[in-house]
Amino acid sequence: MTKIAMANFKSAMPIFKSHAYLKELEKTLKPQHFDRVFVFPDFLGLLPNSFLHFTLGAQNAYPRDCGAFTGEITSKHLEELKIHTLLIGHSERRTLLKESPSFLKEKFDFFKDKNFKIVYCIGEDLTTREKGFRAVKEFLSEQLENIDLNYSNLIVAYEPIWAIGTKKSASLEDIYLTHGFLKQILNQKTPLLYGGSVNVQNAKEILGIDSVDGLLIGSASWELENFKTIISFL
């Protein structure tokens, strides 16, 4: 399976830097990168999607066409920008913004019906990891049980919560074992990415694991040169 690199800007990128980054990345890449390189700016960092060399996605959207949803953007807004790719289930939205499994399912089902490409994020906390691998498997299985795993536009990103933003990536053995388990659950055509303190130093090794189909990258992608280096490992 072709390897993938995704940049998640979170809420860290200044607006004009984000716009400049997208334009410069477009100049750097080639058409064959379109399905292999994804960028998720924050809402103000999005631009009308005329990019041909990478896929532009949104970090979040409310599961309605439009309406009285103060502070949200909806499918109509994204469609006006010609954006049809969306992150759902990131741990920061699950924990900080209290998005429940039932709401994540509602989001998934709504945007599945719109034929969006969905990057669905899962991952266990440190307490679960310390209970052992059996507990991890049960936790991750529960996170996946309410969504359609045969949806053809699904990508799953495994991000152990204890490794996000901590500069402590999971060990290669942990990634190998966990991805091996998840591959048994997922449709064989569904890409499975790893995220969690990915950086220029460890990206190549992680991509070398057969069951890792790509990377979802946070802070290491915020500098364009770093992201370009990681793309070169694909």
From Swiss-Prot:
Keywords: Cytoplasm, Gluconeogenesis, Glycolysis, Isomerase. It catalyses: D-glyceraldehyde 3-phosphate = dihydroxyacetone phosphate. PROSITE patterns: TIM_1, TIM_2. The active site is at H90 (electrophile), E159 (proton acceptor). GO terms for molecular function: triose-phosphate isomerase activity. Substrate binds at N8, F9, K10, G165, S197. Its main location: cytoplasm. The keyword Cytoplasm applies. GO terms for biological process: gluconeogenesis; glyceraldehyde-3-phosphate biosynthetic process; glycerol catabolic process; glycolytic process. Pathway: Carbohydrate biosynthesis; gluconeogenesis; Carbohydrate degradation; glycolysis; D-glyceraldehyde 3-phosphate from glycerone phosphate: step 1/1. It comes from the Bacteria. It is an enzyme of class 5 (isomerase). GO terms for cellular component: cytosol. Its EC number is 5.3.1.1. It holds the Pfam family TIM. It is found in: Cytoplasm. Homodimer. PANTHER family: TRIOSEPHOSPHATE ISOMERASE (PTHR21139:SF42). Involved in the gluconeogenesis. Catalyzes stereospecifically the conversion of dihydroxyacetone phosphate (DHAP) to D-glyceraldehyde-3-phosphate (G3P). Belongs to the triosephosphate isomerase family. This is Triosephosphate isomerase.
